[in-house]
Amino acid sequence: MYYGFDIGGTKIALGVFDSTRRLQWEKRVPTPHTSYSAFLDAVCELVAEADQRFGVKGSVGIGIPGMPETEDGTLYAANVPAASGKPLRADLSARLDRDVRLDNDANCFALSEAWDDEFTQYPLVMGLILGTGGGGLVLNGKPITGQSYITGEFGHMRLPVDALTLMGFDFPLRRCGCGQMGCIENYLSGRGFAWLYQHYYDQSLQAPEIIALWEQGDEQAHAHVERYLDLLAVCLGNILTIVDPDLLVIGGGLSNFTAITTQLAERLPRHLLPVARAPRIERARHGDAGGMRGAAFLHLTD
């Protein structure tokens, strides 16, 4: 059995998957915020419960935000302070007496989608989360992590020149939480979608409200969505020219907006090299379970 943990600032979620990659059981507990020993206990108790329930010693994979293992073997995860700065992988491997594998949660999202029954035919899969700006790359069923675990942090690329041509050269470059100016996640995420609407129309609406107006045929919302899709295509043009994936899977809250997957493909070719083919574009299939799935499938990559 394959055990996949999706760990964040508020919850530790465990999903147990069988050899056919089907979810058999799941359980969630709150994430301890201050005590590292309590954090380790929470994970180990869930593993023990799964072992007893299924009568096996399952493999353990963990998806967590941040850098799973720094040069000195410790975790860097600002959203999980109880474990950040600690040798999480080594400690859990010792306590559980098995090979524990860690990866970035966005990489786990991409891995989950790449191992979907419909998508395993594609050698190079790119996952993009239109919410956090994160993403990941999976080649032949294995995540590409890079030495710093930042492969796929597409949201921290800066606005390209073509974006400024589209939006205007006086378009404000917003400061990102990472400290840089003009990171594309500040414009393409759900909050960015709402910020763009407020910037152009001086109205403060949330993304679902804007989408509802679009669905009702509102002209202003229609113009906003057209501009947003053009901006998304411009930014993806740069990324796809570098990565050239077979499949692009889009997740996050905005992925539920069908216009993104249905209308994006027709906009992409003008921003790619003439010989390039746009990838197949699909909405993420596995929703909230994606993090657990991808973490569990870290043991399918041998």
Swiss-Prot record:
Keyword Cell membrane: no
Pfam family, one: ROK
Gene that specifies this protein: nagK
Binding positions for ATP per the UniProt entry: 4-11, 133-139
Pathway(s) annotated for this protein in UniProt: Cell wall biogenesis; peptidoglycan recycling
NCBIfam families given in the database record: PRK13310.1
One GO process term, biological-process aspect: peptidoglycan turnover
Catalysed reactions, semicolon-separated: N-acetyl-D-glucosamine + ATP = N-acetyl-D-glucosamine 6-phosphate + ADP + H(+)
InterPro entries: ATPase_NBD, N-acetyl-D-glucosamine_kinase, ROK
Superkingdom: Bacteria
Role played: Catalyzes the phosphorylation of N-acetyl-D-glucosamine (GlcNAc) derived from cell-wall degradation, yielding GlcNAc-6-P.
UniProt keyword annotation of Cell inner membrane present: no
Signal peptide as annotated in the record: none
Family membership: Belongs to the ROK (NagC/XylR) family. NagK subfamily.
Name the UniProt record assigns to this protein: N-acetyl-D-glucosamine kinase
UniProt-annotated binding residues for Zn(2+): 156, 176, 178, 183
EC number: 2.7.1.59
GO molecular function, one term: ATP binding
Top EC class of this enzyme: transferase
